[in-house]
Amino acid sequence: MFKKIFIIITSFIFFSTALSEEIFLSLKKDKVNVRYGPSFEFPVKFVYKKIDLPIKQIDKKENWRRIKDFKNNSGWIHSSQLKRINSTIPLNDKILFDKPTIFSKPVAKIKKGRVLIVQDCQNNWCEVKTDNFKGWIENSNLWGEVK
């Protein structure tokens, strides 16, 4: 009896943890079609034109992923257009620093909505890079995967 209860409780904890995990992916190309449904037969809803843009997977069906972006736009993207890379978007303007402290040298001002590639995270800071800059940013008000 105890063994059955233990198995049920363990299964419940495992499945609830697995279901609550957020999955973030990034766009593989600089032009990605988002469709109304999970098939090439569905019309294109809109087109992303930002490589590495972080998106959140909210459902999947075969090779299709239902996604949501930081502006709450949603639709279906074929899995061949997605990749696993830690990218993030600041939800407000931020300062990029040379080291993970506000007392270090400011490197650049990062505008809201700019795609950043996450290199490393320590405490409340993430080391990120853009096309032009590399440095540390506080990880508050970031949308995407920050690990």
PLM-predicted stretches and their roles:
Residues 4-15:
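Sec-dependent N-terminal signal peptides
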Residues 19-36, 46-51, 56-132, 139-147:
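SH3-family beta-barrel domains
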Residues 38-40:
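A cross-kingdom feature marking solvent-exposed beta-strand/loop segments within repeated
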